[in-house]
Amino acid sequence: MTVLAQLYYKYGTMNSGKTIEILKVAHNYEEQGKPVVIMTSSLDTRDGFGVVASRIGMRREAVTITDDMDIFAYIENMFKKPYCILIDESQFLSQKNVYDLARIVDELDVPVMAFGLKNDFQNHLFEGSRELLLLADKIEEIKTICQFCSKKATMVLRTENGRPVYKGNQIQIGGNETYIPVCRRHYFHPPIKA
């Protein structure tokens, strides 16, 4: 029986270890002599353009994805087909980008693992997340705990000057200084001043 490639969507809140997982998977493939392609959204420039970096200091160069990039053609035209494609910040992908990833799996038989946030600070799905939830063959939650208690964090609280923010642009690039992983209770009632 032939094992066919699949599209995986692994989501979690901020600080759940998504990027560490990407770097670990890449290392495991490459230790076996199997090349991978790491890609990330061009919107995330926290650690530099075309860089995937974890909060614990691990980092790798990555191919940047723009909304109009033809990811399918990029992979199809590579001299050596990768064994796996790893996507960071997949919430920022466009519908076209996600459809390209599905085509890579279905037509090129290359597995794709997309990692990202599911919902924004207002609890709305990102475009990339919505499309991945619709098209992924396997969906997995990467869990972390609420910053204020021991419950599972399922939401992201945006803060500004130490205060919760519930309105504003969907995309505002930031890290631990801006976004906090929280449970539902502490999203609606954070133990910080509003």
From Swiss-Prot:
Catalytic activity: thymidine + ATP = dTMP + ADP + H(+)
Keyword Kinase (UniProt): yes
Main localization of the protein described in the UniProt heading: cytoplasm
E.C. code: 2.7.1.21
One of the Pfam families matching this protein, by short name: TK
GO molecular function, one term: ATP binding
InterPro entries: P-loop_NTPase, Thymidine_kinase, Thymidine_kinase_CS
PROSITE patterns the record matches: TK_CELLULAR_TYPE
One Gene Ontology CC term in the entry: cytosol
Residues that coordinate or bind Zn(2+): 146, 149, 183, 186
Top-level EC class as recorded in UniProt: transferase
UniProt keyword Lipid metabolism, yes or no: no
Subunit field text: Homotetramer.
Protein name: Thymidine kinase
Protein species of origin: Streptococcus mutans serotype c (strain ATCC 700610 / UA159)
